[in-house]
Amino acid sequence: MESALTVLSGWGWPVEVVTGPVADHLTEMRPPAPTGTTCTTTSTPTPLCVPDLSVESIKGLAPDGENANYVGFDTMFMVSSIDELGRRQLTDTIRKDLRVTLAKFTIACTKTSSFSSASSTRRRKRHCPSSERVMRSNKSLQMFVLCRRAHAKQIRDQLQSVIQARKPRKYYTRSSDGRTHPVVPVYIYEFSAVDKVYLHRDNVIEADAQAK
């Protein structure tokens, strides 16, 4: 039976008889460390293929101007109010007024978004004695009007006019405390965009050709 050293020598391992300190011979037999020239590659790096996630690739060419399907807007007004009892009626009135008085302009109006903290107020009321004052809830409405910057002044003036001309209700009531309050203020915020935002014409109030 061949010895292990003979087998290793047959495999190409450097084998010799150790007569001196073992550490010195082990250091001599240690294979050289790989250098930059001992490991080479002939394959060329393959560039990463990043999918095109641009608007053009997902939804086709982005509209760069007025066309048959899209309208561009760069100005937005937000109509906001807190604790407005007739919030739906108020925004419906604004929307109808803008449609009539601004018939020569192309605009877009969103539906009214309403937020309320009444549910949390009711939970607090169940855990509080009736003698303690309950924190009143806040109801908020938000409606957005989009237009072009060239028409922003007319839109702004008309929004202020229709809000100031609203008929005050007999009373305004907060749902949590039941007390009456004066007319609730309505706020108008104006935003301008650097790039136009395009909406489909199905969601736009088109300008009346006869009013132009």
From Swiss-Prot:
GO cellular component, one term: host cell nucleus
UniProt lineage: Viruses, Duplodnaviria, Heunggongvirae, Peploviricota, Herviviricetes
Highest taxon listed in the record's lineage: Viruses
Entry's localization field: Host nucleus
Main location (coarse class): host cell
Family (UniProt): Belongs to the alphaherpesvirinae HHV-1 UL3 family.
PTM characteristics: Phosphorylated.
Name of the protein in question: Nuclear phosphoprotein UL3 homolog
Disulfide bonds: none
UniProt keyword annotations, A-Z: Host nucleus, Phosphoprotein
Any matching Pfam family: Herpes_UL3
